[in-house]
A protein has these predicted regions:
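Active-site-proximal helices and loops of the catalytic beta/alpha 8
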Residues: 236, 240-244, 254, 262-273, ...
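Substrate-binding/active-site clefts of carbohydrate-active enzymes
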Residues: 145, 151-198, 205-357, 362, ...
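Short glycine/proline- and charge-enriched loop/turn segments
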Residues: 169, 214-222, 334-336, 420-425, ...
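Carbohydrate-interacting/catalytic domains
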Residues: 1-147, 151, 157, 170-198, ...
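Short, solvent-exposed loop/turn segments at secondary-structure junctions
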Residues: 153-156, 206-207, 252-253, 366, ...
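Glycine-rich, histidine-containing beta strand-loop boundary motifs that form or position
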Residues: 63, 103, 159, 203-204, ...
């Protein structure tokens, strides 16, 4: 809801014209080009956020249009030891409107922020103009959606087992298959629906010689081992009948050497029509191998013959400086079987854009998760969004960008990111316990402020994936730690990301350990984490505030985290207790109803059970 303009001394900037002075000790942050700081609502009103040092006690958005001036008070939405985060939703404003910020220092003096910086006075022309209101069109259905990620070769198998496959449930291998397929996924859709899944995210399904399939041979063919194209069509149709959406995983940065264009380059060299689709440093193609530079995990005696066979190029042993293996063409992280595609080449770019549109248009998928987005030419993603959205305006576009993904989430590229920062936060507080609750709340608040509100609601908040160790393994096998992380995941703003098998308490180290086969026979829906997820997804459906509500951290003790989710007049308190003892929290308000969890509320005092969580309606 937009704020009302208020008469206030800070809003009367007639009195502060003069010679500006630099108040450099005040750290105030606002970037009008970052949607995390300035975004627009559907009615054209502006959502404005500013970060300040905690000592500033009051903040106001000062909007001037012609002779009129309005002051809109910003409210504190989160605090850390380093920053206070202020926010206001105000407007819509006239096209002529210009704005600055005013703050009150502890000594009651005014502090001002304008395009020229932090100052003690405002110059008449030193103001920002509001850009034309434009919505960051994140699909509504993706906001708060429960996303279930699965590794197709290891999730479920349908029919008789091929004798060339490893036995189902055998120790996971980087090179061998266990026979999971898309028909097997269809057979488990009712299970996923019962769990509360809204979106099914599949690791790559296109034809490839590897079980991870990030080295694609044919982008127009679903791997026959998975059942082929019609198996995907059937999966999409059956999932949609259960109101589950499907997003595919695309790796357009690199291909397998058997990809038609690279194969032509390998055979014809500079005469190939596809020569500029790749970045070849030397011709003829070859591999330089430096045995004395190899790490212990890289067994060159095993891998070099494999690479020579797959790529069809010779290798030579050298003893100079350089990486252990160096192809004479650019490849993803130097892996010879993943030559990089030159997406600045118009034809290569056009090919990949056609692929992106094809699966949305012809097979009805609901979006894409794009691999290693950081390493692709940034403007490719502008074209990618335009092409996919032309086919399906509400397609969900998810990027894999480790760390701060802000540059990819300004409304012109992706809708959301795989939120590995969220995972790191959960690992440090819940799995290993090496940070205290106040540090956890600081980082959660910083994460909340990092992106625009639509992006925050759509970010995939994962605690595990195919590229990480499983959370239970990170937690030393202590299931209560996974339980607490799941409670936080299901109550913090965003789209909770479940990695297949975590609901069954699967363990496993990093790749390939985290890619084991689902054990459908010895586990079932009575497993504690499975039941927890079912309960919380059901609660999310009943309580829109847990999905769309504003977030604010309220308190942190050594092991107790308390925050609220508020949507209009509905306010929920979430309490998570990491301690082995019961915890108490004195809440404001006269009424407290326990909606879920272990504990109770009496006379404003809320008690949370040991190593458990609680959701309270206030």
């Amino acid at each position: 809801m937009a704020s009302r303009a208020e008469p206030h001394p800070l809003a009367d900037d007639h009195g502060v014209y003069g010679m500006p002075g630099d108040l450099s000790p005040w750290d105030i942050r606002f970037d009008p080009e970052d949607r995390a700081h300035l975004d627009f609502e559907s009615d054209g009103s502006a959502r404005v956020r500013v970060w300040t040092e905690p000592e500033l006690v009051e903040a106001m958005l000062v909007v001037r249009s012609g002779r009129s001036v309005e002051g809109h008070a910003l409210r504190v939405v989160a605090r850390t030891a380093r920053f206070t985060f202020w926010e206001v939703v105000a407007g819509p404003f006239q096209e002529s409107a210009r704005f600055t910020f005013a703050f009150r220092a502890p000594n009651a003096e005014g502090v001002y922020l304008a395009p020229s910086g932090v100052t003690n006075a405002i110059e008449r022309l030193d103001r920002w103009a509001f850009p034309a209101p434009s919505l960051h069109s994140v699909p509504e259905w993706s906001k708060g959606a429960v996303i279930y990620q699965l590794f197709p070769d290891r999730f479920a198998r349908h029919g008789a087992m091929d004798t060339d496959l490893d036995p189902w449930g055998s120790p996971p291998s980087s090179t061998r298959f266990q026979g999971g397929d898309l028909a097997g996924v269809v057979g488990r859709l009712d299970y996923l629906s019962d769990l509360g899944v809204d979106v099914l995210y599949l690791n790559p399904v296109f034809t490839s010689p590897s079980n991870h399939r990030y080295d694609t041979i044919d982008y127009h063919e679903v791997d026959p081992l998975l059942g082929g194209n019609e198996a995907l069509r059937n999966l999409v149709d059956e999932a949609h009948r259960r109101s589950i959406r499907i997003i595919l995983d695309g790796s357009f940065n690199h291909v397998h050497p058997e990809f038609f264009a690279f194969r032509d380059v390998a055979g014809r060299g500079p005469a190939s029509a596809y020569w500029d689709w790749f970045l070849v440093d030397e011709w003829p193609l070859r591999l330089r191998v430096r045995p004395d530079r190899a790490h212990s995990f890289l067994d060159l005696a095993v891998w070099v013959p494999v690479w020579e066979s797959e790529i069809g190029v010779p290798s030579e042993v050298v003893h100079d400086d350089g990486p252990a293996v160096e192809p004479s063409y650019q490849a993803w992280y130097g892996v010879p079987t993943m030559p990089r595609v030159n997406l600045t080449n118009p034809d290569a770019r056009g090919y990949m854009l056609d692929v992106a549109a094809h699966w949305v248009r012809e097979y009805g998928i609901d979006g894409w998760r794009m691999d290693v987005a950081r390493y692709v030419d940034p403007d490719f993603w502008d074209d990618f969004r335009r092409v996919v959205r032309a086919v399906r305006p509400d397609a969900y576009l998810l990027c894999e960008v480790m760390g701060d993904a802000s540059d990819w989430l300004q409304g012109n590229r992706f809708d959301a990111t795989m939120n590995y920062t969220f995972r790191d936060l959960c690992v440090h507080f819940f799995a290993t316990g090496d940070i205290a609750a106040d540090v956890f709340c600081d980082r959660a608040a910083r994460l909340w402020a990092q992106y625009s509100w639509p992006v925050t609601l759509a970010n995939q908040n994962l605690i595990g994936s195919h590229d990480t160790a499983r959370f239970l393994t990170e937690a030393g096998g202590e299931e209560w730690r996974l339980r607490l992380a799941t409670i936080f995941q299901m109550t913090y703003p965003g789209a909770p990301g479940i990695y297949y098998g975590d609901e069954m308490g699967m363990s496993g180290g990093e790749d390939p350990g985290s890619r084991g086969a689902m054990d459908w026979e010895s586990t079932g829906p009575d497993h504690g984490i499975h039941s927890l997820i079912r309960e919380l997804t059901e609660l999310r459906r009943k309580e829109p505030a847990l999905v769309m509500g504003d977030w604010r951290a309220l308190s942190s003790q050594a092991n107790l985290v308390v925050f609220e989710r508020r949507l209009i007049d509905r306010c929920l308190l979430v309490l998570i207790n990491r301690s082995s003892a019961r915890a108490r929290y004195e809440a404001s308000g006269a009424s407290h109803e326990v909606l879920w969890g272990e504990g109770g509320a009496e006379n404003g005092v809320i008690t949370v059970g040991p190593r458990s969580g609680l959701v309270i309606a206030q």
